[in-house]
């Protein structure tokens, strides 16, 4: 996990960035590894930073182990306008509050920059989303969340350069929101 609150140079409002892996085994293994206390302490420290930051929304990049996207419909990347967490491998279940107008605005921004994300009006998210949300912000429904799915398992995969360019475009959208007073 790499929490890194940053003030973007062009933004009037600070933005915050965090990155965390997940482990489905943390909820279903018989014995805790010796590193678990340290990992959970980092999660608690990050949660305190998020609470102090008071985000208006969270943008969450995620992948999927075929819990919500399957071979029959596997977009390279997709933005959710409504999302639900499924209770697999110890993950939390329930509706995730997605600010659909913000999701649509992100899609429109990405399209204006030459990207064509898929759109999901009912995105199923799995433990890779719900476990980190519970550990890092306390619950899956604590803050509005925009899910952005990127396929990392099903060939043909996007080239790394394309993924980076999408990330930069998302960053510009976040910076524009920050300039307008939205904390992401």
Regions found by a protein language model. Give the residues of each.
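Active-site beta-strand/loop microenvironment that shapes enzyme catalytic pockets
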Residues: 158-184
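Short, surface-exposed, charged loop/turn segments at secondary-structure junctions
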Residues: 73-83, 133-137, 163-167
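Internal, conserved structured core segments that host functional sites
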Residues: 104-106, 111-164
